[in-house]
Amino acid sequence: SYMLALPDDEAQAPTITVGEANFGLYPMATGQSRLARRFYDEAPALDAVRAKAGLPLDADAAFAVGLVTSNPDDIDWADEVRIAMEERVSMSPDSLTGLEANLRFNGQENMITRIFGRLTAWQNWIFQRPNAVGDKGALKVYGKGDKAQFDWHRV
């Protein structure tokens, strides 16, 4: 996740505020809060975030406690976002479905995460799509040195 740092303009700098709802009011399919999942249930990391509850955190403060993974300033922002978008566009739209499912249903496994996180995305969606198994699909050209041709309109 990216958050813009504006060190020269604190009044305009975006902030993020964590509240009690972030600690379990809306559990994931794993039964964990999203913060617990993000920090792998590690108490020191969760305690550091809880200590900041109710405080507006700028990009540097949010990065320091692990709430964001990147905090580029306004000089680097456009390039960082462009690179992230180019990397994402280079992937098959169907593979992104699988990556999203892996992120949404990660962590402690149970029957719900197995069905909706793995089986549904991979068996019923990704491996049946032309982007994977078509003539120029990723699975057909894998290892041959050819570049897959993706149908971007199927997303």
Go through each PLM region and give its residues.
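C-terminal alpha-helix plus adjacent terminal tail
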Residues: A48-A64, T69-V155
